[in-house]
Amino acid sequence: MYAVFQSGGKQHRVSEGQTLRLEKLDVETGATVDFDNVLMIANGEEITVGAPLVAGGKVTAEVVQHGRGDKVKIVKFRRRKHSRKQQGHRQWFTEVRITGISA
């Protein structure tokens, strides 16, 4: 059984027991989070696709940790001008473990 839900402007395909990183959520570590924006649920051969959401569909997850991703370097280089600009960015994330999918 798997589901596709939307969180942080992105769509995620998940199944029970899976761990994934989402955009930072404002919840405590160890808390339970319910995602109601379920776009599709597949249970064996039975597939339910929402228009746009599945009525009564819910994905439940437990927050494992919060953290920051790897550094991404941004470099702007102007050739022949003796000019260079460097910047770095680390995106905040929330790691969750999927505990249940219901339709």
Swiss-Prot record:
One of its GO terms (cellular component) is ribosome. SUPFAM superfamilies: L21p-like. Transmembrane segments: none annotated. GO terms for molecular function: rRNA binding; structural constituent of ribosome. Signal peptide: none annotated. It holds the Pfam family Ribosomal_L21p. GO terms for biological process: translation. Keywords: Ribonucleoprotein, Ribosomal protein, RNA-binding, rRNA-binding. InterPro entries: bL21-like (IPR028909), bL21-like_sf (IPR036164), Ribosomal_bL21 (IPR001787), Ribosomal_bL21_CS (IPR018258). This protein binds to 23S rRNA in the presence of protein L20. Part of the 50S ribosomal subunit. Contacts protein L20. Belongs to the bacterial ribosomal protein bL21 family. This is Large ribosomal subunit protein bL21.
